[in-house]
Amino acid sequence: GDVYKRQVSDTVRRNITIGLPRVLAFWDTMPFWTTFWRSLGFEIQISSPSTHKMFEEGLSAVTSDTVCFPAKLVHGHIRDLVKKKVDRIFMPSIAAIGSENTESTSESMCAVVKGYPLVIRNSDSPEKQWGIPFDAPLFYWYREEDKERQLITYMEQTFSIQPSETKKAVLA
């Protein structure tokens, strides 16, 4: 409770709202991402829970009939974030995540899930269509230090945020 509030209130407010789509494996890591962005002073907007209407609204952008339903639904979530007037949409491709069992093994994700942010960038093109930057960095997270190092680089290049601030946010 209090520790989290204090930490956020001490943070510089950036007046940038980051849209996070409530989709695919990205949803499983949402607690990390919401804490990460908020502790760096960003506002967060998560897309609404999935509905059939949301699915239908995104269908025009679906490039393949054979792609799975959860992937098709992503297009509707992107449109939902556009309606919520976010400043940027963040949907990383995370190529590998460390296994909970041992340090030496990694579990790989479904290729569609892994590559879907690139599909969104090309088919929906949020920047071109709605003027909303669509950030889809590719992360290779085999070990905890990969996560920290790659996020430090991404935040420094994208938002000019100091490595020490990003490091604190990763651990928040």
Pin down the residues of each PLM region.
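Short glycine-rich or small-residue beta-strand-to-loop segments that form or flank ligand, phosphate
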Residues: 16-22, 61, 91-92
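Short, small-residue-biased leader/transition segments that mark boundaries at the very start
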Residues: 3-4
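Cap/lid and interdomain-hinge subdomains that line or gate substrate/regulatory clefts
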Residues: 114-172
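Short acidic, glycine/serine/threonine-rich loops at helix termini
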Residues: 30-32, 56-61, 99-108, 145-154
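A short, charged/proline- and glycine-enriched loop
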Residues: 8-18
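Short connector loops at secondary-structure junctions
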Residues: 42-66, 137-144
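Short, glycine-/Ser/Thr-/acidic-enriched flexible segments
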Residues: 23-26, 51, 94-96, 139-141
